[in-house]
């Protein structure tokens, strides 16, 4: 996901983009949960001696990122929000089957909530609702590799556990709102307007929670870095540089 932006970002920041446990090249955890993922990434950051940091929030990475941010808010230099949900009011109709599963975790509801865990559903992460001319810029190798990884031992179970566990993240939305209200971290939004999974209205909730948030809406889908990596990297570089300068000004004052 970050392959195209890491070279640019490394000009001004030390970039750490690990695969979450059970994703990519990372091993599967025996006990799968977003807090467990947060602890694993926190241990990695401590091992690397990382202090203050910018945190990228996207989809399943948002619960992990907030776990890290809320454990040590003084370390957060800024948030970069890219198609991530943190507000109860912004769940669209596409979440109905998942919410039904959270309320009534029957086998039937689980099957409906996880029906997208197929090759076609994996492809939809990239292409669903995306205009054809934009979708044409994404090579099929991307979702083919994702599907290969999902089919490895333990990976499908990881996906199912996270879908169920996302309800516990949703239950933390009030605490997240309190964190944002108290700390008001410098924030940059990069949002693909054609996302089939996260409602565009969520952008308003973010900006209401963070009135000084810088927001940019792209003609892209859920995985906007696949099609708009260059402008996204430029915006992130500018955001980090300005945040660094403001931090220096506060120190001098």
Predicted features and spans:
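Catalytic active-site module of serine/aspartate enzymes centered on a nucleophile-bearing elbow/loop
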Residues: 212-253
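Flexible "cap/lid" subdomain of the alpha/beta-hydrolase fold that forms the substrate-access gate
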Residues: 16, 23-56, 60-216, 238
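Conserved HGGG/HGGXW glycine-rich cap/lid loop of the alpha/beta-hydrolase fold
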Residues: 1-25
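Generic recognition of short, well-ordered alpha-helical segments
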Residues: 1-4, 29, 201, 205, ...
């Amino acid at each position: 996901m970050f392959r195209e932006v890491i070279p640019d970002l490394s000009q001004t920041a030390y970039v750490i983009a690990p695969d979450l446990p059970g994703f990519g090249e990372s091993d599967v955890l025996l006990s799968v949960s977003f807090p467990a993922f947060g602890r694993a990434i926190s241990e990695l950051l401590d091992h690397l001696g990382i202090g203050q940091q910018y945190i990228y929030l996207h989809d399943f990475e948002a619960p992990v990122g907030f776990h890290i941010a809320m454990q040590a808010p003084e370390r957060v230099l800024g948030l970069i929000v890219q198609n991530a949900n943190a507000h109860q009011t912004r769940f669209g109709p596409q979440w109905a089957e998942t919410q039904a599963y959270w309320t009534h975790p029957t086998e039937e509801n689980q099957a409906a909530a996880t029906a997208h865990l197929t090759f076609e559903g994996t492809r939809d992460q990239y292409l669903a609702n995306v205009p054809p001319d934009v979708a044409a810029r994404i090579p099929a190798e991307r979702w083919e590799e994702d599907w290969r990884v999902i089919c490895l031992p333990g990976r499908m179970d990881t996906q199912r556990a996270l879908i169920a566990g996302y309800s516990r993240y949703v239950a933390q939305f009030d605490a997240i709102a309190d964190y944002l209200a108290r700390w008001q971290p410098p924030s940059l939004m990069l949002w693909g307007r054609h996302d089939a999974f996260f409602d565009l209205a969520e952008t308003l909730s973010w900006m209401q929670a963070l009135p000084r948030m810088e927001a940019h809406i792209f003609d892209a889908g859920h995985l906007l870095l696949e099609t708009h990596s260059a402008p996204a990297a430029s915006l992130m570089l500018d955001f980090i540089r300005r945040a660094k300068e403001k931090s220096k000004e506060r120190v001098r004052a």
